[in-house]
């Protein structure tokens, strides 16, 4: 039986509660691919952070999470890119990478930090 996008969202929320950055990363990419999202936006605000997906031209909020997890999540993306420096927070960085999702789909992604 295939796992649905809703089940991956539940897993993402569970990963956030447990502060499991590896699972947050894996579930976020899988949800994005399975939802046919063109973009993933990870945004920090003063009191919280959020993840949004661009689907059919619209940004849709996926989840909010505590600001205490933000640096770890961004660092995970930078490390997985293999081309970004996790310790660089002042300058924008770009990378391209091919990876596999939890559903064994190969994806090509471009990551940018601002």
Residues covered by each model-derived region:
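N-terminal "pre-motor" subdomain/linker immediately upstream of P-loop NTPase catalytic cores
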Residues: 2-114
